[in-house]
Amino acid sequence: MSKMKTKSGAKKRFKLTASGKVKAGQAGKRHGMIKRTPKQIRNKRGQVTLSPQDAKIVKKYLPNGL
């Protein structure tokens, strides 16, 4: 049987931590920043840890743990 391939879109968007959690970029910063307060924009920086339910789905896309 051949090796499982990693989904290209998933490897660009998600990172697996050493403890097995999945990190992703914060959503909601593509456009429409003018109506948001500076605090809201600041809080959108960085990454968030996905919920266990979402992490389970994403891990199927990253069989090699990229």
Curated annotation (Swiss-Prot):
Pfam families listed in its UniProt record: Ribosomal_L35p
Record bears the keyword Nucleus: no
Record PROSITE patterns: RIBOSOMAL_L35
InterPro entries named among the record's database cross-references: Ribosomal_bL35, Ribosomal_bL35-like, Ribosomal_bL35_CS, Ribosomal_bL35_sf
Keywords: Ribonucleoprotein, Ribosomal protein
One record GO biological process: translation
SUPFAM superfamilies according to UniProt: L35p-like (SSF143034)
Any single GO CC term annotated in Swiss-Prot or TrEMBL for this entry: cytosolic large ribosomal subunit
Region (Disordered): 1-35
Compositional bias segments (type: Basic residues): 1-15
Any one GO molecular function term: structural constituent of ribosome
HAMAP family for this protein: Ribosomal_bL35
Family designation: Belongs to the bacterial ribosomal protein bL35 family.
Protein's name in the database: Large ribosomal subunit protein bL35
Species assigned in the record: Maricaulis maris (strain MCS10)
